[in-house]
Each structure stands twice: as structure tokens, then as C-alpha cells.
């Protein structure tokens, strides 16, 4: 009977997991929640060379804050779309700023796999950061990230204007934000 209860509980957890996302082993109540309309909390983490990069240094540009990991299949499948959109909009003029940047916060635990994934997926933007703490990343906790990929679209004034945009939805949001 005990095995049936355990299997039933496992099935419920599996059924509640959104398709195409990898979930965190952290209780949701331990995490913050950043919503559309909130000011984006600042993040400061090392890049692969050890230099600290801050999200706030990109103020004045539209930013996609992208939580991902080298081991996350859905994240890696979305990367070609993010690269395409980055190349298309990096110099665009928006109503709240000029230019589009990606701030990639990796939830990897190992630096080598993280750097290898950046190169293999052709992630050409300069803002790759990680504290290499995996799901225990302070950035993930601050933003309430409990599944990846997770994205926050931030306008040039630092306000979150959309969450979890993927595929064509990201490009459509950027088009709508362009200066008229």
C-alpha cells in the first residue's frame, strides 16, 4: 500500500509539471515572485572570465533576462530563437531605450559545461553570468524561478513588461515595444 501511495504522489508531481520545462527542487514559498509591472531587482554575478556583470548596467536598453542551463533540453532548444532575435533587435530603437541585450543567468553547477554550451549554441551576447550554484542560485531565488527556461523582458527603465516569452511571442513583444 505504501508503494502505491508513493507512486501516486510521484504521478501527481509529474502531472503538475508544465511540459517543456525543468523544475526546481526548492519550495515555492521560499522564493520571491517578480511580476509584470515590477521593477526588475538588480543582479550581479561573475561571467566566465570572472568579471562581475550587473543587470543594472544595461539600463536604457530592452533586456531579456534568461534563466537557463546547459543540461536543460528545452532551454537549449529555445537558444536558436534567442540568438536570431538578439541579432535582429540588438541595435533597434525602442520606446524606452535603444538596443536589445540578453542577460543569461545559468543555473549550471559546472563551469566547463556552461562555457561549452555558450560556444556550441553560438550565444554571441556578452552578458553570460552564473554563481554555479544550480537551483540554489541567489538570482533564481530572487526572481522566484522554479522552472527553466524562464525569461523576464525588461524595458529600458528597468520595469518587467513580460514573463516567459518563447518563440514568436518574444519577437512580437519586441516589435510592439519598438519606437514608432
Residue positions per predicted region:
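Alpha/beta-hydrolase fold active-site loops
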Residues: 62-63, 100, 149
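Short, internal strand/loop/helix patches
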Residues: 103, 108-110, 115-152, 156
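Short active-site neighborhood of thiol/selenol oxidoreductases, capturing the structured segment around
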Residues: 54-76
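N-terminal "domain-start" segment that seeds a small globular fold
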Residues: 22-56, 173-175, 179
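Bacterial Sec-dependent N-terminal signal peptides
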Residues: 1-27, 180
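Thiol-/selenol-based redox modules, centered on thioredoxin-like
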Residues: 148-180
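Conserved helix-turn-beta segment immediately C-terminal to the redox Cys motif
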Residues: 77-104
Amino acid at each position: 500500500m505504501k508503494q502505491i501511495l508513493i507512486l501516486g504522489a510521484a504521478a501527481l508531481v509529474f502531472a503538475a509539471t508544465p511540459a517543456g520545462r525543468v523544475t526546481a527542487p526548492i519550495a515555492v514559498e521560499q522564493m520571491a515572485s517578480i511580476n509584470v509591472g515590477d521593477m526588475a531587482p538588480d543582479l550581479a554575478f561573475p561571467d566566465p572570465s570572472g568579471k562581475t556583470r550587473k543587470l543594472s548596467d544595461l539600463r536604457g536598453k530592452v533586456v531579456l533576462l534568461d534563466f537557463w542551463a546547459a543540461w536543460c533540453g528545452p532551454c537549449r532548444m529555445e537558444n536558436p530563437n534567442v540568438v536570431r532575435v538578439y541579432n535582429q533587435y540588438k541595435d533597434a530603437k525602442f520606446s524606452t531605450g535603444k538596443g536589445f541585450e540578453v542577460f543569461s543567468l545559468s543555473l549550471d553547477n559546472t563551469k566547463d559545461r556552461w562555457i561549452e554550451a555558450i560556444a556550441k549554441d553560438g550565444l554571441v551576447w556578452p552578458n553570460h553570468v552564473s554563481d554555479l550554484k544550480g537551483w540554489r542560485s541567489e538570482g533564481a531565488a530572487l526572481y522566484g524561478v522554479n522552472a527553466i527556461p524562464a525569461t523576464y523582458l525588461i524595458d529600458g527603465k528597468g520595469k518587467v513588461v513580460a514573463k516567459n516569452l518563447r518563440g514568436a511571442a518574444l519577437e512580437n513583444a519586441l516589435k510592439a515595444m519598438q519606437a514608432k
